[in-house]
Regions:
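Conserved alpha/beta enzyme-core scaffold
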Residues: 1-178
Length: 178
C-alpha cells in the first residue's frame, strides 16, 4: 500500500495511476528508458500492463533503453508480444523471446559498452527519451526520487524524459535511502 512513508509529497497523490493507465502513456515508436542494472531495480507493473494491452490489440512497438540487462517483466513480456522495436545497450540472453527476436532480425539491437551508453543518451545521440519508467523506494517531500538497488541510467533518463512514470516498490526497505 502506498502511503506517506513512501510518497511524502501530498501533492503527488493526485498523480497516482494504475499500471494500466501508466501503460496507456506509452505509444508506438517511443524511446523508453527504464531503471535497473541486471535484474535489480527495474520497473515491472507498467511493462506487464503494456504487454497485456498489446495482447488485447494495442499497436505499439518501442525502443527499450536501460543501464544493463533487466528482468523478464520487461525483456520477456514485451518481446513475446512483439512490442520491442529496438534494444540498447544490453539484454539478458535468458529471456528467450528477446533473444529470438534479435536473432531473427525483428528487434534491432546494439550491443554497446555499458559505460558509454548513458553519456551518449545525455548528448542526444539516439534521439529523445520519450518516457522514463523508474522503480523507486520512495519520493521525498521535495519530490526527489529515492531509487531502488539498481540505478543504471535512471538519472540520465529522468533528466531527459518528456514523461516520467515512477513505480514505487513497497517491498524495498525504506532504509535503502541515504
Amino acid at each position: 500500500m502506498l502511503d506517506s512513508t513512501r510518497l511524502r509529497n501530498p501533492q503527488l497523490f493526485d498523480k497516482i495511476v494504475t499500471p494500466e493507465e501508466a501503460a496507456a502513456l506509452i505509444t508506438d515508436g517511443m524511446n523508453v528508458g527504464v531503471s535497473g542494472f541486471t535484474p535489480s531495480g527495474y520497473p515491472k507493473k507498467s511493462t506487464i500492463a503494456l504487454a497485456k494491452a498489446i495482447k488485447e490489440g494495442k499497436r505499439c512497438r518501442i525502443n527499450i533503453w536501460s543501464g544493463a540487462s533487466v528482468g523478464p517483466e520487461i525483456e520477456e513480456e514485451l518481446a513475446a508480444v512483439g512490442a520491442i522495436k529496438g534494444r540498447m545497450p544490453y539484454y539478458a540472453a535468458s529471456n528467450k523471446s528477446m533473444k529470438k527476436g534479435i536473432n531473427e532480425g525483428k528487434i534491432e539491437y546494439v550491443d554497446q559498452h555499458l559505460s558509454h551508453f548513458g553519456q551518449q543518451v545525455d548528448y542526444g545521440f539516439f534521439g529523445n527519451v520519450d518516457v522514463a519508467i523508474i522503480e523507486a523506494t520512495a519520493i521525498t517531500a521535495e519530490g526527489n526520487i529515492i531509487l531502488g538497488p539498481g540505478v543504471g541510467n535512471a538519472p540520465i533518463f529522468v533528466k531527459h524524459a518528456k514523461k516520467i512514470i515512477i513505480e514505487v516498490n513497497t517491498s524495498i526497505p525504506l532504509n535503502l535511502e541515504g
